[in-house]
């Protein structure tokens, strides 16, 4: 065997077992399809979409990825560190509704109690601390919260950022000198295009860094394309380099394989192995049945002042709870996110998809000057306040993989409405928040046109598809994250989460991966 354990993916669900299983004495190999991203790469990403976006088919070699499906648009990160490269480092625990959700409440586990210590461990490892700043955008969000009758819930977000002394590099402040040197946050607002200062506690600064020191091997440019069980036990993983498909890789073998390729990557790989390659034909028929968007919506308000500059600070610095099931944060955008202006349209209400789309298009046609003024606004990224709205309510889409009339040449992942009828493209609380914010600043409120015209949810926090369940009829993995029917094959990323978290899920994914790793047997125990 090449390794004791192969981990596919280096995001939150993969980096935790990379460290913890290395601590238990296992030989660990981590496969990552993207590159190891340097500070120079991050600075370049703020200036060039080619350096920001991951679209290897056309030579875009960045670390930010967008997936567009009929019912949902998904954004995420690719590279060593996965989603942590482009996340806003918000580290929140979910509310009671998540732990009591019927999707996993009857599995014989008190999830709130059992995960409690793992949340603490995850918070320590990711360096959680309250955001110390309060600027103009935070004032505006506070006013929005008060206008919605939720002012008492407003506050700073707990965050995985080393604030320290701005711009000053100091010895590791987190792991007793065992971690890398760190530089204090300069409040540049570029968290979402990568922290070139090294202040954000991305996974390459903690779990992956420490795992490598213990002997774990991280292999960038390795996309897993098949998993095959071996006679006598163990698995073989075949890989390719997405940026150079002519590059030949020898298949890697390990006694155990952990799949943590992000929801889209994990589903695509497991569907391919089950239905196309037939190497894992016994994977549950429930694969892809219940995928969650965290019931998310993206809205915004544009300041009327062309000289406004809201970019100073972390990407997200404050939040509030509009009601028991709705959580709202603000977002600052870096220069590299200026392309997002083309996704914004007028704010329109309504649950009837066709009528809402017509209303949006009519508003654009009837008010062309307002539309053009917003689209071509000077200093747009400095003036825009984006709100991420998340809910813990039950909603879902389903994913399948196959040939489609629009592209019959090869099987592709595609979405369909879930058992609940789909995820919301319209969230009333989101539109209310955007409208209240715009009224407060004298600006214009906006919807994302993928939601208002396309009737698709937009999320940075996709969940589910390989849900934890009591058996293969209901889900893909058991309470120890092992795939039903395949001993030694596990799924530990967000795709194992069966319910909407309702807040930014990074801390929850990390805590679940910590629980998995703790329950993983010591080397030689079996």
Briefly describe each language-model feature range.
Residues 5-30:
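N-terminal Rossmann-like FAD-binding beta1-loop-alpha1 element of flavoenzymes
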Residues 49-133:
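Redox-cofactor-proximal catalytic regions of oxidoreductases
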Residues 11-12, 264, 496:
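Residue-level detector of alpha-helix initiation sites
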Residues 23, 34-44, 197-200, 205, ...:
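Glycine-rich loop(s) and the adjacent beta-strand/alpha-helix scaffold that form part
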Residues 68, 83, 87, 284-411, ...:
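FAD cofactor-binding and catalytic pocket of flavoenzymes
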Residues 61, 157, 188-191, 229, ...:
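A glycine-rich dinucleotide-binding beta-alpha-beta segment and adjacent secondary-structure elements
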Residues 133-181, 185, 330-340, 345-393, ...:
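Patatin-like phospholipase A catalytic core
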Residues 106-221, 455-458:
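Conserved redox-cofactor binding core of oxidoreductases
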């Amino acid at each position: 065997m090449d390794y004791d354990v192969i981990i596919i993916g280096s995001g939150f669900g993969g980096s935790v077992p990379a460290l913890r299983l290395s601590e238990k004495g296992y030989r660990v190999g981590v496969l990552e399809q993207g590159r190891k991203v340097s500070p120079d790469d991050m600075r370049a990403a703020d200036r060039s979409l080619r350096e920001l976006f991951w679209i290897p088919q056309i030579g875009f070699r960045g670390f930010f990825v967008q997936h567009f499906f009929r019912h949902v648009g998904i954004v995420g990160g690719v590279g060593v560190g996965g989603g942590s490269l482009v996340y806003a480092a918000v580290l929140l625990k979910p509310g009671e509704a998540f732990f009591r959700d019927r999707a996993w409440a009857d599995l014989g586990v008190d999830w709130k109690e059992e995960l409690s210590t793992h949340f603490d461990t995850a918070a320590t490892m990711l360096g959680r601390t309250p955001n110390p700043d309060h600027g103009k955008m935070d004032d505006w969000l506070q006013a929005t919260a008060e206008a919605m009758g939720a002012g008492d819930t407003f506050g700073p977000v707990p965050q995985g950022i080393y604030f320290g002394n701005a711009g000053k590099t100091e010895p590791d402040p987190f792991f007793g000198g065992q971690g890398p040197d760190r530089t204090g946050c300069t409040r540049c607002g570029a968290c979402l295009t990568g922290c070139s200062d090294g202040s954000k506690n991305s996974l390459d600064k903690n779990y992956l860094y420490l795992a490598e020191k213990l002997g774990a091997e991280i292999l960038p440019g390795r996309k897993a394309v098949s998993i095959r069980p071996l006679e006598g036990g163990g698995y073989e993983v075949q890989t390719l380099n997405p940026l150079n498909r002519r590059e030949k890789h020898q298949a890697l073998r390990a006694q155990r394989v952990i799949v943590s390729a992000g929801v889209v990557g994990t589903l695509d790989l497991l569907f391919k192995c089950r239905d196309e390659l037939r190497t894992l034909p016994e994977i549950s028929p429930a694969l892809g049945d219940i995928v969650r968007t965290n019931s998310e919506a993206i809205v915004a308000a544009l300041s009327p002042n062309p000289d406004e500059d809201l970019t100073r600070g972390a990407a997200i610095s404050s939040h509030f709870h509009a009601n028991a099931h709705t959580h709202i944060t603000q977002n600052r955008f870096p220069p590299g996110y200026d392309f997002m202006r083309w996704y914004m349209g007028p704010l329109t209400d309504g649950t009837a998809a066709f009528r809402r789309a017509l209303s949006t298009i009519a508003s654009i046609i009837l008010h062309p000057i307002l539309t053009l003024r917003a689209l071509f606004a000077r200093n747009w990224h400095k003036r825009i306040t984006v709100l991420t709205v998340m809910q813990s309510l039950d909603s879902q889409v389903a994913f399948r993989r196959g040939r489609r009339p629009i592209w019959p040449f090869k099987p592709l992942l595609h979405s369909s409405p879930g058992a609940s009828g789909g995820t919301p493209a319209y969230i009333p609380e989101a539109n209310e928040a955007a409208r209240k914010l715009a009224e407060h600043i004298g600006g214009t409120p906006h919807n994302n046109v993928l939601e208002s015209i396309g009737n698709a949810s937009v999320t940075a926090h996709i969940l589910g598809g390989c849900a934890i369940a009591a058996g293969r009829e209901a889900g893909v993995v058991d309470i120890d994250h092992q795939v039903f029917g395949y001993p030694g094959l596990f799924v530990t990323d967000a795709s194992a989460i069966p319910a909407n978290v309702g807040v930014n899920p990074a801390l929850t994914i990390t805590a679940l991966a910590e629980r998995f790793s703790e329950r993983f047997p010591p080397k030689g125990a079996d």
